[in-house]
């Protein structure tokens, strides 16, 4: 038993290994090198450190401490050198005794977490060991003995239940229901339930009868108890419920039945294990998968805080870990020690499980990242990044671009703002160029003020407001021609001029504050460009007003002075009438010369203006390209968004289709499950009806009206009445005829002798068996045997009783028709029925599904049966049985000098075979035992008083059944024949066949036959398959007993062939009525 270190028990409750704890508690840190100076000792100042016993112990154990105590291994504190004597026998014994108590018995190790026992120990599975009761006959009274063995006839059991308390408990607090359920006696359980016994009585381990039935895998009894209302959730002293034991046994069908009857799937035992956690801990993958389908809690914790995943990792089961990870279980959960599943996998070096956990974590990260990504948000971020890039190209400084741009939430709004900004900048540029606002020296990029060449007394028109409006109109026309895309239909020239001036003032203010110039798509305008554009505007105006001969263009370009007007407009001038203006001749000449100079300058300025105009157009084209590029990127993002939305809608449709298919599958599975449950209910009702009819017939039927049951075997014939527990007549199936006429003079000589009479006169008779290897070969002799059965053995008239005859499997159709014809035409029976011998043997064991290995005197059959129907395609026949064994025994006895030749001596050998022979579990080992010892030899006294010794012949004779080569036969043994028959059956019923292998016939009565069959079939079957050999004590007559049960049913009258039906249809009716 492994020690669990979840909590430190009290000092008085810990088992003291050979009295050392009481002696060593205070000397520990003095006696063991690994504990010196550790400060862990409980020794006080008055501790007796010089005790002689502890000195001796210290001298012996000083160098072995590190190797003898699990808590000190690997601590590096031992004084043992490389040459230390680690194999001393005394220390080996001490280490074996003290290893598991170390952390409880030595104060220095408590809580040190150095023990190799484990941080949280392991679970005690003693609750699941030895499920069946240990029963002694002297401890049981009559009722309990009958419930345990189930050998009491039904009538006697019914009478016994009337006179006894059905709830009486024995010394172990077991009721009759406990014993019958644990041993699988379903008939007794049925009777007890009909008597309304208490269902939830607890034995000495607080287990109900239902728990014992589930624990011992007696499914039929468990289902009966569940139907009558037994509580499946009552825990035993270990805290285990019925579902825990079903999971431990990997009995998925029983677990399903328990859940249908309300078993708690989340119940915990004293270790905190739910059925799911128990299945994981025991590495029962199939039931774990079943519980997951039944929605068991995957996050349940045991008392150490461990989840199913941590338990699977600790057990090293990669398949269960993979199964749990498919359910999206939490891999980050920690137990009470703070460790996760991955940490346990790493510390235990489970590399495959580590890889599974790593792959699962990567998949989860990818899934989370894909869920967080949103197509609309991606499109929005794309447009914002593009807008920010466009904005950054304008606002960023030449030396360093900003690494954290401001993200705008609306990409379209930002594009519109950019376009408005460029529009306002362009308009402001043109207006500032034409208006000449603010004074400067030319260094700051402003228009320099030119000196006026007009005389001081020069006259100007009085209508200054009209000039102002004409200038505004001129500027508006120019803007419409140069930038039609950025102008608005309802724009006001005065507002545009005013806004442009304000923006230019803001730009100038930014220049004065030392801000670097903006890196935008529009080219830098220098002083010369300003002057050229100004002159171009002036020339255009002069062309319109040249007829007036007034110097208005000059005044237009030179009239603005620094500091005149903060609003950026041209200040008004004093009006002068042209009529009063007079120019002297010198002034006229000067005027004409100035005019010519101005004309030349204007021509040059026109060329420069054209160049400037081309540059402006190129700049506008660049702006258009930028805007088109942004629009294309936005359209591409919109297309991607549409594609993602389309893909999303497609995925939703696929998910909907998958959900529909899943619902359809669930519905179909529910329908199948419902159908299976209905079939189970119908089978149960049918069985109940059969049992009730059997009980009724047992109480009412007497010998005068009972059916006659005749089992025709190759060597023996068994006959009796339906309802009896055993046949009334058993005699050899032989017919003897005198070898010579008149040999028996003085006596009334018969033509033939049958049965025991023929065997007693075998010395003068020729004996014949009318049935060879299970098939009737001589119908005249067989008719004599039946006549002897009716009139001599049973002493009844066959015309007054229905008859049930047995036949071997695969009996020819002609033989079946001949049997029917003889019964109705020769013996005039009122009704008859023919039943297969293997099916009747299975009925005797209380089952309807299983495989029967029937070995009698002449033939051996292995017959798989499903729901009472034999499977002919999987039935195998072996012409090896009990009749060949006496001849083989006579042969091997001659090796020791014993010679048997006559028919009488052959009967002596047959008696030796039946009384002394047995089946060896291991033939080779048994032969070696006989060669070295005489313990297996037995003595046999012959009729003349001579005593002979039988040695290895005892088990060599029946070994021929498993190794036919001993007889010179080239065929499989009975175990291989049984296995081959199971493998020929359908895959779905093989498990039921393995667990319900029934032995039948006289040849299977050898001691050790069941254990040898268990061993041999287990070696041939799959390793995980459970093998169960059923060997009834009276299997020699199991065929006849099964016929007695069948003929006792009230429904048997519906099964048999009546005389009227035979007269109407003839012998062939046997094929329709007797399947």
Curated annotation (Swiss-Prot):
InterPro entries recorded: Actin, Actin/actin-like_CS, Actin_CS, Ankyrin_rpt, Ankyrin_rpt-contain_sf, ATPase_NBD, CC144C-like_CC_dom
Pfam families: Actin, Ank_2, CCDC144C
Region (Disordered) residue spans: 369-530, 544-596
Basic and acidic residues compositional bias, start-end: 377-392, 401-424, 466-483, 495-530
Gene Ontology annotations of biological process type: axonogenesis; cell motility
Listed Polar residues bias regions: 485-494
Coiled-coil segments on the chain, per record: 399-435, 642-698
Tissues in which the UniProt entry reports expression: Expressed in breast cancer cell lines (at protein level).
Location(s), subcellular: Cytoplasm, Cell cortex
Mapped ANK repeat ranges: 172-201, 205-234, 238-267, 271-300, 304-333
Membrane-spanning ranges: none
Region described as Actin-like: spans on this chain: 702-1075
Keywords, sorted A to Z: ANK repeat, Coiled coil, Cytoplasm, Repeat
Keyword Repeat annotated: yes
Any one of the GO CC terms: extracellular space
A molecular function (GO) term: protein kinase binding
Family, similarity comment: In the N-terminal section; belongs to the POTE family.
Misc: Results from the insertion of a beta-actin fragment at the C-terminus in the POTEE paralog gene leading to the formation of a new functional chimeric protein. This insertion occured before the divergence of the Old World monkeys and apes.
Protein name: POTE ankyrin domain family member F
Gene expressing this chain: POTEF
């Amino acid at each position: 038993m492994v020690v669990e270190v979840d909590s430190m028990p009290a000092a008085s409750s810990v088992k003291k290994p050979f009295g050392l704890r009481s002696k060593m508690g205070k000397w520990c840190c003095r006696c063991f090198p690994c504990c010196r100076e550790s400060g862990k000792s409980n020794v006080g100042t008055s501790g007796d450190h010089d005790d002689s016993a502890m000195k001796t112990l210290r001298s012996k154990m000083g160098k072995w401490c590190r190797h003898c105590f699990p808590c000190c291994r690997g601590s590096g504190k031992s004084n043992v050198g490389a040459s230390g004597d680690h194999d001393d026998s005394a220390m080996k014994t001490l280490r074996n005794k003290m290893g598991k108590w170390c952390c409880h018995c030595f104060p220095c190790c408590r809580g040190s977490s150095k023990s190799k026992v484990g941080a949280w120990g392991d679970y005690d599975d003693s609750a699941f060991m030895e499920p069946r009761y240990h029963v002694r006959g002297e401890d049981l009274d009559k009722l309990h003995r009958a419930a345990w063995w189930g050998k009491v006839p039904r009538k006697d059991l019914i009478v016994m239940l009337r006179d006894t308390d059905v709830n009486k408990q024995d010394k172990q607090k077991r009721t009759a229901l406990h014993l019958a359920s644990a041993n699988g006696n379903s008939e007794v359980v049925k009777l007890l339930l009909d008597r309304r016994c208490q269902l939830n009585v607890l034995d000495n381990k607080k287990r109900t009868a239902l728990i014992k039935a589930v624990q011992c895998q007696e499914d039929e009894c468990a289902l009966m108890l569940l139907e009558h209302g037994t509580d499946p959730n009552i825990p035993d002293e270990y805290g285990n419920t019925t579902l825990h034991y079903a999971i431990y046994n990997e009995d998925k069908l029983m677990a399903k039945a328990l859940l249908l009857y309300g078993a708690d799937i989340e119940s915990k035992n004293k270790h905190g294990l739910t059925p799911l956690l128990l299945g994981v801990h025991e590495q029962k993958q199939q039931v774990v998968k079943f519980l997951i389908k039944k929605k068991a809690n995957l996050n349940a914790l045991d008392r150490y805080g461990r989840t199913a995943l941590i338990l699977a990792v600790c057990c090293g089961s990669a398949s269960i870990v993979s199964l749990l990870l498919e359910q999206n279980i939490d891999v980050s959960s920690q137990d009470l020690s703070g460790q996760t599943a991955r940490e346990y996998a790493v510390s235990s070096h489970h590399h495959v499980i580590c890889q599974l956990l790593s792959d699962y974590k990567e998949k989860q990260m990818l899934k989370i990242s894909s869920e967080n990504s949103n197509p609309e948000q991606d499109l929005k971020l794309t447009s914002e990044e593009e807008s920010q890039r466009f904005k950054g190209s304008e606002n960023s400084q030449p030396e360093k671009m900003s690494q954290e741009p401001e993200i705008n939430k609306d990409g379209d709004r930002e594009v519109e703002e950019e376009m408005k900004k460029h529009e306002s900048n362009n308009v402001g540029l043109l207006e500032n160029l034409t208006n000449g606002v603010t004074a400067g020296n030319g260094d700051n990029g402003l228009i320099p003020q030119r000196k006026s060449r007009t005389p001081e007394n020069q006259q100007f028109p009085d209508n200054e407001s009209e000039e102002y409006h004409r200038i505004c109109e001129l500027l508006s026309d120019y803007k419409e021609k140069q930038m039609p895309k950025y102008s608005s239909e309802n724009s006001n020239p005065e507002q545009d001029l005013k806004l442009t001036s304000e923006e230019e003032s803001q730009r100038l203010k930014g220049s004065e504050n030392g801000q670097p110039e903006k890196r935008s798509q529009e080219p830098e305008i220098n002083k010369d460009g300003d002057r050229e554009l100004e002159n171009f505007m002036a020339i255009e105006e002069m062309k319109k007003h040249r007829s007036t001969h007034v110097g208005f263009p000059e005044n237009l370009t030179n009239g603005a002075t620094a500091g005149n007007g903060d609003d950026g407009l041209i200040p008004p001038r004093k009006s002068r009438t042209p009529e009063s203006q007079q120019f002297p001749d010198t002034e006229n000449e000067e005027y004409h010369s100035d005019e010519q100079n101005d004309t030349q300058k204007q021509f040059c300025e026109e060329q420069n203006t054209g160049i400037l105009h081309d540059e402006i157009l190129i700049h506008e084209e660049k702006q258009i390209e930028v805007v088109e590029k942004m629009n294309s990127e936005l359209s591409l993002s919109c297309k991607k968004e549409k594609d993602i939305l389309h893909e999303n809608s497609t995925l939703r449709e696929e998910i909907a289709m998958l959900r529909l298919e899943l619902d359809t599958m669930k519905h179909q599975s529910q329908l199948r499950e419902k159908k299976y449950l209905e079939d189970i209910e119908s089978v149960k009702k049918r069985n109940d009806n059969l049992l009730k009819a059997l009980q009724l017939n047992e109480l009412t039927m007497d010998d005068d009206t009972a059916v006659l049951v005749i089992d025709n075997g190759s060597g023996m014939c068994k006959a009796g009445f339906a309802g009896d527990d055993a046949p009334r007549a058993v005699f050899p199936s032989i017919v003897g005829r005198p070898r010579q006429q008149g040999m028996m003079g003085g006596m009334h000589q018969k033509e033939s002798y049958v049965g025991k009479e023929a065997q007693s006169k075998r010395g003068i008779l020729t004996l014949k068996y009318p049935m060879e290897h299970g098939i009737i070969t001589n119908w005249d002799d067989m008719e004599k045997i039946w006549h002897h059965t009716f009139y001599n053995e049973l002493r009844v008239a066959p015309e007054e009783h229905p008859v049930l005859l047995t036949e071997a499997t695969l009996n020819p159709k002609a033989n079946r028709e001949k049997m029917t014809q003889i019964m109705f035409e020769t013996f005039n029976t009122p009704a008859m029925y023919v039943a297969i011998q293997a099916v009747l043997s299975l009925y005797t064991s209380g089952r309807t599904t299983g495989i029967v290995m029937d070995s009698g005197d002449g033939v051996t059959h292995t017959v798989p049966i499903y729901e009472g129907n034999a499977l002919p395609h999987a039935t195998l026949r072996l012409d090896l049985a009990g009749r060949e064994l006496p001849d083989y025994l006579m042969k091997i006895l001659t090796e020791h000098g014993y010679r048997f030749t006559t028919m009488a001596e052959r009967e002596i050998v047959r008696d030796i075979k039946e009384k002394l022979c047995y089946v060896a579990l291991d033939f080779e080992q048994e032969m070696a035992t006989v060669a070295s010892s005489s313990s297996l030899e037995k003595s046999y006294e012959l009729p003349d008083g001579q005593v002979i010794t039988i040695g290895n012949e005892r088990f060599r004779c029946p070994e021929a059944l498993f190794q036919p080569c001993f007889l010179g036969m080239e065929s499989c043994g009975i175990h291989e024949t049984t296995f081959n028959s199971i493998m020929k059956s359908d895959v779905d019923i093989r498990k039921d066949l393995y667990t319900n292998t029934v032995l039948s016939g006289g040849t299977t009565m050898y001691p050790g036959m069941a254990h040898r069959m268990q061993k041999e079939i287990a070696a041939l079957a799959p390793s995980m398959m459970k093998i169960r050999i059923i060997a009834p004590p009276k299997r020699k007559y199991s065929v006849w007993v099964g016929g007695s049960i069948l003929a006792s049913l009230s429904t048997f009258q519906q099964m048999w062939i009546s005389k009227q039906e035979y007269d109407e249809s003839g012998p062939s009716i046997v094929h329709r009525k007797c399947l």
